[in-house]
Amino acid sequence: MELTDEQWAVLDPLIGGMPRRADRRGRPWRRSRAVLNGILWILRTGAPWADLPERFAPYQTCHRRYQRWVREGRFERILEALATDLKERGKLDLSECFIDGAFIAGENRGGCVGPTKRGKGTKLMAMADRFGPPLAACAASASPHESRLVAPTLDSRFVAALPQRLIGDRAYDADPLDAELAKLGVEMIAPHRRNRKRPKTQDGRPLRRYRRRWKIERLFAWLGNFRRLVVRYERYALNYLGFVQLGCILILLRQG
């Protein structure tokens, strides 16, 4: 997959150029569009960097540029710019948002790797807005319960505003979580666990919104189309998260 002219026109001013030495010595920088297309090929196929076709750029160039962009937080800034623009144009709705996590198997080393019954892995957390596009994404160890990963997920959101309502499955039925979010002005909506011992705190009225939770499942299906995200090959969690952010960028570009 390669960027269309319309998509590149949006990304070009956001991704920025690369600095040159004052004496202009050394090899010239490869064009950012060719390099980014090469990185997106890796994202889509999940192939090793060394298998990158020569029509893009040398794989060493794409790999170095990718790591540099990740360190500089460029993908994060692009997401913030795209999401803010969509929100201002009414194409993002924070009146109700959906949250969920997915277990990602991969390397038994590096950061954000933890043991579970399914083996060691990483938990990919994501939040979708009322229409379904991504609003937040973060990577964490797979060991903690998902209810403990809500705060990091909210902190990774692409816009400044908080959602009015946050909808999740039974894993998010936790009174301390409800109280913590209520202090932020966020209403947590989740079905009660079958083994819940405390009195119920929700009735059928807010739970009607739970029927639209399929939108977060659709978001994970969209992300699953990028094979580099299905299994974590990166030793460093930040490099894996960079690919997640790239996938979210492509999804947001389609909403424009």
Language model region names:
Residues 1-256:
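Short alpha-helical elements
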